[in-house]
Curated annotation (Swiss-Prot):
Region Large ATPase domain (RuvB-L), residue ranges: 1-182
A single Gene Ontology CC term: cytoplasm
Any Pfam family hit: RuvB_N
HAMAP family named among the record's database cross-references: DNA_HJ_migration_RuvB (MF_00016)
SUPFAM superfamilies: P-loop containing nucleoside triphosphate hydrolases, Winged helix' DNA-binding domain
UniProt gene name: ruvB
Compartments where located: Cytoplasm
Chain positions recorded as Mg(2+) binding sites: 67
Record function comment: The RuvA-RuvB-RuvC complex processes Holliday junction (HJ) DNA during genetic recombination and DNA repair, while the RuvA-RuvB complex plays an important role in the rescue of blocked DNA replication forks via replication fork reversal (RFR). RuvA specifically binds to HJ cruciform DNA, conferring on it an open structure. The RuvB hexamer acts as an ATP-dependent pump, pulling dsDNA into and through the RuvAB complex. RuvB forms 2 homohexamers on either side of HJ DNA bound by 1 or 2 RuvA tetramers; 4 subunits per hexamer contact DNA at a time.
Binding-site residues, DNA: 292, 311, 316
UniProt keyword list: ATP-binding, Cytoplasm, DNA damage, DNA recombination, DNA repair, DNA-binding, Hydrolase, Nucleotide-binding
Protein name (Swiss-Prot/TrEMBL): Holliday junction branch migration complex subunit RuvB
Region (Head domain (RuvB-H)): 256-345
Length: 345
């Protein structure tokens, strides 16, 4: 999956790997209150019984803190943290090397687990359930099965596409956790915390302006904060207020709701070329010259959350909110069109 470079893309970039702004404990972590409360209970219970924590599956859009929470869990459990991703584990031997090097209670984090090789996934089942590796050594008549006992570990996995996980794999996670987009108030706290860490003078209105445009995503909030700091240090005295934040983000083509040029192209294309829809995802992908999965996983979730598009049986359709945001007049029969489309289901 690839997408044109975007300031507000929720995927990791080089600068995002900087641990400076990441919270180190559950107490420092802002947002996802129910998730934090539940994880605290599960962690304390596992420590009290001196057992490995049950396997955890984080589900949600990119940039919401899945990796950060996995690191925090290992830290709070007092165990080692090992990290990899689904596409990196190409063969059974790669997984075996990871698992046999784990110590008792260690946390193994697998990002993008929905992209795991099916042959590797088969090896993972007994490892998760029985803490054993079943490997075939040799070939042909000389082949034999070997069982290797593993230390009891905790697998923490992350996915943006739960539907791509097989049922057997999904069912082996005892603690499924769904992460949701953050509120503006939560993002404002995250921005303030980041500014303190960066020793950056930040006014209340400046923090709010950055939070409003962060698309409900902490990773984007941190990235916008850094870019606004650049503008403030060059074009001003280093202090960030609403005017500086607005000027910087407007120049970076991030509008008041966090939409960028690609989002507006998406909405404008449906409005101007297809009368507001419905239009199929393949047509949209061709029109934007972007891959379908990138549109479904990265562009559309936030637009749906903001009430700008609807997914109907016949394709994507703009809502009245989208027409207003574009400054265009919606079709007079928009409401009836939407009713008719959903009656076709």
């Amino acid at each position: 999956m690839s997408l044109s470079p975007r300031l507000i893309a929720p995927e990791k970039r080089g600068e995002d790997a900087d641990q400076t702004l990441r919270p180190q404990t559950l107490a420092d972590f802002v947002g996802q209150a129910a998730v934090r409360a539940n994880l605290k209970v599960f962690i304390e219970a596992a420590k009290g019984r001196n057992e490995a924590l049950d396997h955890v599956l984080f589900v949600g859009p990119p940039g919401l803190g899945k990796t950060t929470l996995a690191q925090i869990m290992a830290r709070e459990l007092g165990v080692n943290f090992r990290s990899t991703s689904g596409p990196v584990i190409a063969k059974a031997g790669d997984l075996a090397a990871l698992l046999t090097n784990l110590e008792e209670g260690d946390v193994l984090f697998i990002d993008e687990i929905h992209r795991l090789n099916p042959a590797v996934e088969e090896i993972l089942y007994p490892a998760m359930e029985d803490f054993q590796l079943d490997l075939i050594i040799g070939e042909g008549p000389a082949a034999r099965s070997v069982k290797i006992d593993l230390a009891r570990f905790t697998l923490v996995a992350a996915t943006t596409r739960l539907g791509l996980l097989t049922n057997p794999l999904r069912d082996r996670f005892g603690i499924p956790v769904r992460l949701n987009f953050y509120t503006v108030e939560e993002l404002e706290q995250i921005v303030r915390r980041g500014a303190r860490i960066l020793q950056m003078p930040l006014g209340d209105d400046g923090a709010l302006e950055i939070a409003r445009r962060a698309r409900g995503t902490p990773r984007i909030a941190g990235r916008l904060l850094r870019r606004v700091r650049d503008f403030a240090s060059v074009a001003g005295d280093g202090h960030v207020d609403r005017l500086i934040a607005d000027e910087a983000l407007t120049r970076l083509e991030v509008d008041a709701l966090g939409l960028d040029a690609l989002d507006r192209r998406y909405l404008s294309m449906i409005a101007r070329n297809f009368g507001g829809g419905p239009v199929g995802i393949e047509t949209i992908a061709a029109g934007l010259s972007e891959p379908r999965d990138a549109i479904e996983d990265i562009i559309e979730p936030y637009l749906i959350q903001q009430g700008f598009i609807q997914r109907t049986p016949r394709g994507r359709m703009l809502t009245a909110n989208a027409w207003r945001h574009l400054g265009l007049d919606a079709p007079k029969d928009l409401a009836q069109q939407q009713i008719n489309l959903f009656q076709e289901e």
